[in-house]
From Swiss-Prot:
It comes from Aster yellows witches'-broom phytoplasma (strain AYWB). GO terms for molecular function: ATP binding; ATP hydrolysis activity; DNA binding; excinuclease ABC activity; helicase activity. Residues 28-185 form the Helicase ATP-binding domain. ATP binds at residues 41-48. Keywords: ATP-binding, Cytoplasm, DNA damage, DNA excision, DNA repair, Excision nuclease, Helicase, Hydrolase, Nucleotide-binding, SOS response. One of its GO terms (biological process) is nucleotide-excision repair. Forms a heterotetramer with UvrA during the search for lesions. Interacts with UvrC in an incision complex. This is UvrABC system protein B. SMART domains: DEXDc, HELICc.
Amino acid sequence: MSLTNLFKLQSSLKPSGDQPQAIQKLVNNFKQGLKEQILLGATGTGKTFTIANIIQHLQQKTLVIAHNKTLAGQLYNELKAMFPNNRVEYFISYYDYYQPEAYVASSDTYIEKDSKINDEIDQLRHSAAGSLINRDDVIVVASVSCIYGVGDLKDYQKSTLHLQIGDKYERKNLINKLIELKYQRNEINFQRGTFRVRGDIIEIIASSSKEIGIRIIFFGNEIENIQNFYVLNGKAIANLKLITLFPASLYATNNQKLQESIKRIRQELKEQINHFEKTNQLLAAQKIKMRTLHDLEMLEQIGNCNGVENYSRHLALKGKGEAPSTLIDFFGNDFLTIVDESHVTIPQIKGMYFGDFSRKNNLVNFGFRLPSALDNRPLKFNEFQEKMNKVIYLSATPGDYELTKKIPIVEQIIRPTFVLDPEIEVRPTNNQMDDLYFEIKHQTKNNQRILITTLTINMSEDLTTYLKNLGIKVAYLHSEIKSLQRLEILKDLRLGKYDCLVGVNLLREGLDLPEVALVAILDADKQGFLRNERSLIQTIGRAARNITGKAIMYADCISPAMQIAIEETYRRRKIQKQYNETMKVTPTALNKTILETISIKQKERIKNEKGKSKVQKKLQINTNMTAKNKEIKRLQKTMKEAAKALDFEKAATLRDLILDLEKKEKR
């Protein structure tokens, strides 16, 4: 692959509307040495397509950061379709559930870390890391998970195993090497991150794969053949000349470095015990001694321990306060960063370090963790800035941080479809439910979709139930729905399985839904984050891809935020209308392909669903509707809210109650 033509954008579309001038300005500014720019693009103007063209022009590895998993998934699908011959990867948090380790001093309560890892997302994370090391034509779409510590890049590279036919390699040495790379030998449960031995054959399932394995065939002490094969049936796919095998863990390290790390941990333990004894904190001294010695024993025996990430500073042989290794380090020095919906993403990146520090500092002060655990953290904002090279802040409503930087702002107002911004109506709250129902029925007759945004979760739930009882095909999109499932719901809305989506804070930035013709904003005049001018402009923009797009604000007065949002929307409408009249063009409907979602297991789920009998399906529905399951869901919601509010004691109590209920359900 030519280094000057790594990225090849494949699309039947050509830049149009404001896209050509935006692409040219952004590319020229970078070529002139500018490092940061803002792309102020109205909703539906094709900002992702503009970014894809910039990637093709610059020919550089690209990191796209989104502020939530739903938007990250959508961007991943779109960019993967535009760059089918390049590596487009997905890197988000792999936790389905995460209760962090914490200590509540007021009640002397220690809460152990509890988590559930999504194996599918972990696989995608490994794939992203491997691609960045192995290739130059890589785009990674990530959440803010990319600023959290992962294993050291140099260790990961050194641990990479290269094998080719004809290599002299004793079978037992390869087995030992695989164990060093954190692969587990498992002859029975052969799955991702394991290997098995059958005579002169070693079979491996890499950390970045699940369905395709690697087969190493020996003849004596020589590698005679290498194959990849289907894990399901063992059938060979192709013979390979060589393979590159990445570690099964992002925290891989060699034995020599591990021994040095253990020495450093012992030294820090000694210093911390002395500190506690001098300050007469004898209980804390005893706790840290017992915990750390147990962890050291595990590290010496198997090279791993529970909470190994808390020793990441020592494992990477870094100094106190030094920035942790993150996915960003895997990009090298010269790469492009796209901060999507920057008005939300930048504040999110800024706040990550402080929340992490306040929780861990308690653990250190009371003898549950060594001070070095504080360096197992997300990047501080200044560290994030230092790692950036070329940056585009992407938003329809740039935030204060971007606007105060005095960097070029490139506007993209005209849509390729020449569709105008939505019309806005302000209606009184009196009889708003009846009015909303009438609007929904009117839109569904024309095969259009509707988004409704409320202020509270309870209001969303009640409204969803109310509309369901009226026969509306409606779904409730909320934060507790798993990231991949959210993408399925959005796809189902476009396909017509649902006519209407109700939500609180997930129906704003970036959702690309051309079928949505109506956005209803309840309590639009209420002051606060969910109804400030940026939030209102973003929410109105959800209907901006539809020719008949309209936004209805239900309010009893026009708030200052509403006034700004209405004025900005009509400023853009005026520019768009003048352009259409001057160029003699007519708005056209956007027929956008409905892309497959990320889920690797999707086909398997469909197959299993088809195999169920009607009786089984009915039984499953009845079971899901039991009062006990409803209570479990309610408790899970409360538990997550408590964890977000840093009320870890309450969260732990709720977790234990949920586990108890689930055990009773199984009986």
